[in-house]
Amino acid sequence: MRLTKRDYEVLSLLNRCRYATTKQLVELYFRENKPKTATRRANLLTKKLLNLGLIHHLERRVGGVRAGSGSYIWFITHKGIKELRKIDPSIKLRLKNRYEPTRNHLKHQLFVTQIFVELKILDADEKMLLENFSFEPKCWRSFATLFSHFTLKPDAFARLTIGNFEDAYFFEADNATEHLGRVVAKCKQYIAYYNTGIEQRENCIFPMIVWIVPDEKRKMALETRIREDLDAYWELFSVITLDEFSNFIQGGQDD
């Protein structure tokens, strides 16, 4: 069976983001259709790729079994990656994962995928131009200090243009599962990287570091710790909820 351009787009997405729900595929590729039609078209596409052995879904579902086929969580198979390599030999093969991801890991990965979805929707609606979006590990940054070598591991990186302005972001998807002390420690890694000047020399600007959190309670707690523990460096960071994300990206949120 011949693959379409959209088939390859879905395979490429799953190779980059690791996991995506049917709903997220609908939002990315079928927004021009009415909801029922969009879901049906997404189901047909995933069924085709599933039957070809190029993708598969986890046993668990978003919303449980009663949510139907629209609740599946999809991932690319080894065969799917090999298919992608036919058009892009630079893509690396990965070892098969024998086990399903933990609940927290999966929730985190889908959160990062949703950040990408939100940006693509803004791009499609011509609210901004998404120049680049990198998932892990492509968004990682390696650097050295006087004492050691480090790898900064953002959850994602994005570069976008709004009007005549170019913005860049490191994103951290926070599900309120990490102790605040570990979050602050991650912030200090960003500060260490900022102080190397590497990003500024290569790209002229240092990306805004955005922590995206599930609710206002977590937002207030994280903002307070950042201001208390990071001295003047707190200005490198913003903390928002996912509901605030679209408005924030468009410049509608105060610092």
Where are these regions (language model features)?
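Flexible, glycine- and charge-enriched loops at secondary-structure boundaries
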Residues: 4, 35, 39, 105, ...
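Hydrophobic, Leu/Ile/Phe/Ala-enriched alpha-helical segments that form helix-helix packing faces
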Residues: 29, 46-50, 115-123, 190-198, ...
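C-terminal regulatory/effector modules of DNA-binding transcriptional regulators
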Residues: 156-255
